[in-house]
C-alpha cells in the first residue's frame, strides 16, 4: 500500500503472517480572527462542498510498470460480479486485498458470501473509478465495506474525507438497497508522524459527514495499535502499515460483529403498527 502499484502476492506471503479571507475588524473585547485559520476553514468548506478535488475525481491508476495488472484486476472483479451473488462486498486498498489471504477471511467473511475487491496502492479516486466502471453493475449486495484513504498522498485530510464521502454517495446511488460500512483509517508508522495526524483528521471528518446518512456506518476498529510510548509494534503491523494476523484479528472481529447485526436487522420482519 506504500506505492501506487499492486503488491505482489508472493511478497505479501513472504513478509506477512497472513499470506493487516476577508479581513474584518473584530468587535472590541474579542480577539482578532486568524487569517490563516479562516483560509484553511474556507478551503475545507470548498472541498467538502464539491469543488474540484483530485481525491473525489474518478481516476484510473497509471500503468507505470507497463504490465497492466491494475486494469486486469479491475476486469476480473467485474467478471466476478457477473456470476456471483454476494451479500457483502469489500472494496479498498491493500488492507482489503491482503485480508483475502488470511484465514480470518475464510472464517468470518466467506460464510457471508463476500467478495473482495481490494487493490494495493489504491486511493479514493481509484476506487471511485472502479465503481463507476462496472464493479457494482451486476450485483446487489446488502452491505458494501469501504476501506481506503491512507494512500492518498499529496491530498489534504479534507480532500481525502470528501473522496470517501463521494464513494459512499456513489454506492448509495448505484446500490440504494445496500448499507455502507466505512472503516476508519488506521495509524501508521512506528513512531508519531504527520500521516497519523492526517488519518486521524480524516476519520473525524468522515464520522461527522456520515452521521447524516442513515444507510452509512462508520466503524473505528482500531483496538489501540499505538502504545503508550507512541510506537506501533511490528507484531501488529509487520511494516508499520500493513496488518499481521494478530493485527487483523481485533479489526475483523469488530467488523464481523457489525456486519452480522446489519444483516440480521435486514432480515427482521416488519413490526406491526400499533
Enumerate the predicted regions with their spans.
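Conserved beta-strand scaffold positions in the cores of enzyme catalytic domains, especially
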Residues: 114-116, 218
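Short, glycine/acidic-enriched loop or turn micro-motifs at the edges of active sites
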Residues: 96, 121, 223
Amino acid at each position: 500500500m506504500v506505492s501506487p502499484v499492486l503488491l505482489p502476492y508472493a511478497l505479501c506471503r513472504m513478509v506477512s503472517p497472513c499470506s493487516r479571507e476577508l479581513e474584518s475588524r473584530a468587535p472590541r473585547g474579542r480577539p482578532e480572527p486568524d487569517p490563516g485559520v479562516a483560509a484553511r476553514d474556507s478551503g475545507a468548506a470548498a472541498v467538502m462542498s464539491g469543488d474540484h478535488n483530485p481525491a473525489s475525481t474518478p481516476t484510473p491508476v497509471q500503468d507505470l510498470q507497463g504490465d497492466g495488472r491494475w486494469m486486469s484486476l479491475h476486469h476480473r472483479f467485474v467478471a466476478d460480479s457477473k456470476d456471483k451473488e454476494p451479500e457483502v462486498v469489500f472494496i479498498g486498498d491493500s488492507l482489503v486485498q491482503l485480508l483475502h489471504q488470511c484465514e480470518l477471511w475464510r472464517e468470518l467473511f466467506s460464510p457471508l458470501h463476500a467478495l473482495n475487491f481490494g487493490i494495493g496502492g489504491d486511493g479514493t479516486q481509484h476506487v471511485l473509478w472502479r465503481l463507476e466502471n462496472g464493479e457494482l453493475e451486476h450485483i446487489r449486495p446488502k452491505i458494501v465495506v469501504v476501506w481506503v484513504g491512507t494512500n492518498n498522498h499529496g491530498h489534504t485530510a479534507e480532500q481525502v474525507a470528501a473522496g470517501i464521502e463521494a464513494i459512499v454517495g456513489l454506492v448509495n446511488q448505484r446500490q440504494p438497497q445496500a448499507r455502507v460500512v466505512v472503516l476508519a483509517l488506521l495509524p501508521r508508522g512506528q513512531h508519531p508522524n504527520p500521516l497519523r495526524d492526517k488519518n486521524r483528521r480524516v476519520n473525524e471528518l468522515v464520522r461527522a459527514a456520515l452521521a447524516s446518512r442513515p444507510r452509512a456506518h462508520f466503524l473505528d476498529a482500531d483496538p489501540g495499535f499505538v502504545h503508550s510510548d507512541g510506537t506501533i509494534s511490528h507484531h501488529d503491523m509487520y511494516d508499520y502499515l500493513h496488518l499481521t494476523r494478530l493485527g487483523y484479528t481485533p479489526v475483523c472481529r469488530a467488523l464481523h460483529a457489525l456486519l452480522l447485526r446489519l444483516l440480521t436487522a435486514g432480515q427482521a420482519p416488519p413490526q406491526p403498527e400499533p
